[in-house]
Amino acid sequence: MSDQIIARVSQSLAKEQSLESLVRQLLEMLEMVTDMESTYLTKVDVEARLQHIMFARNSQKMYIPENFTVSWDYSLCKRAIDENCFFSDEVPDRWGDCIAARNLGITTFLSTPIHLPDGSFYGTLCAASSEKRQWSERAEQVLQLFAGLIAQYIQKEALVEQLREANAALIAQSYTDSLTGLPNRRAIFENLTTLFSLARHLNHKIMIAFIDLDNFKLINDRFGHNSGDLFLIQVGERLNTLQQNGEVIGRLGGDEFLVVSLNNENADISSLRERIQQQIRGEYHLGDVDLYYPGASLGIVEVDPETTDADSALHAADIAMYQEKKHKQKTPFVAHPALHS
């Protein structure tokens, strides 16, 4: 193998690039070494029995189309693998029944299968020409080398994608309350920063509703933690259904939830209070017990984001909630054995 090819391969591998970018460079070099008109990479779906041409280089009159799919069972590549014949300069005579080869005018064909490091079959790396070309050991070596490099790169990209997906899942998990599926405290505070910035830009005020579920500890103590968890889950589901554009709804932790809304001409504290209470108040089915819940303690404040930051607004809503809890008439929940069990 010439020093020029080795140098170009080394340069290509040293760059951070996509699979497509790498393959296109290798196809160009493969064309130089094999003296073929077309070089191309295919991916094979063995279950569907289809071969897909992913990337192709065509420098002369022969044209191998990209994004072209053929039957795997009737392809040149499968014939080459089945017969262990990876080079032929007599394709019309040897594989004259191959319609694709006949339509493309292929006379000389060189290919090698690509197996990923885990042993799975990926596809083929090929070179073809409408004219007779001689086989060379150098061309065979380069073809095998490039097939191995592509296999390694495909495996690397797959691993990187798995890492990306795992990282995205971890990020999503870190921003989600595991019990209710609502945004958690971390997500709430980050969304608040964005919401306050938006409100300043729109010259809107912000309403913050701090929600404390009265008698939640009593529900837990009397009916067990499973019933308590079901209660929290159902409260979260109900709050989620009232979400409107420009609102942040989440669980701060324990029995505390938060609703933050961009104020507009059609909204006020009393209407937001009623929306929330209507959602929370009502029947809950908690496994072996049905429970009528009269409502939560709400602390709702309206703030100007130009003069009040998110932390101060939350603190004010928290104080307002405790003031309501302190002065509200105690209305116990009513529970009875579940009729649906």
From Swiss-Prot:
It catalyses: 2 GTP = 3',3'-c-di-GMP + 2 diphosphate. Residues 18-154 form the GAF domain. This is Diguanylate cyclase DgcP. Transmembrane segments: none annotated. Residues 204-337 form the GGDEF domain. PROSITE patterns: GGDEF. Its EC number is 2.7.7.65. Pathway: Purine metabolism; 3',5'-cyclic di-GMP biosynthesis. It comes from Escherichia coli (strain K12). The active site is at D255 (proton acceptor). Substrate binds at N220, H225, D229. Disruption phenotype: Decreased expression of CsgB, decreased curli expression at 28 degrees Celsius. It comes from the Bacteria. One of its GO terms (biological process) is negative regulation of bacterial-type flagellum-dependent cell motility. Gene3D superfamilies: 3.30.450.40, 3.30.70.270. Keywords: GTP-binding, Magnesium, Metal-binding, Nucleotide-binding, Transferase. Binds 1 Mg(2+) ion per monomer. Its cofactor is Mg(2+). Catalyzes the synthesis of cyclic-di-GMP (c-di-GMP) via the condensation of 2 GTP molecules. Cyclic-di-GMP is a second messenger which controls cell surface-associated traits in bacteria. SUPFAM superfamilies: GAF domain-like (SSF55781), Nucleotide cyclase (SSF55073). The keyword Lipid metabolism does not apply. Pfam families: GAF_2, GGDEF. The record marks K217 as: Transition state stabilizer. SMART domains: GAF, GGDEF. InterPro entries: Diguanylate_Cyclase, GAF, GAF-like_dom_sf, GGDEF_dom, Nucleotide_cyclase, Rev_trsase/Diguanyl_cyclase. It is an enzyme of class 2 (transferase).
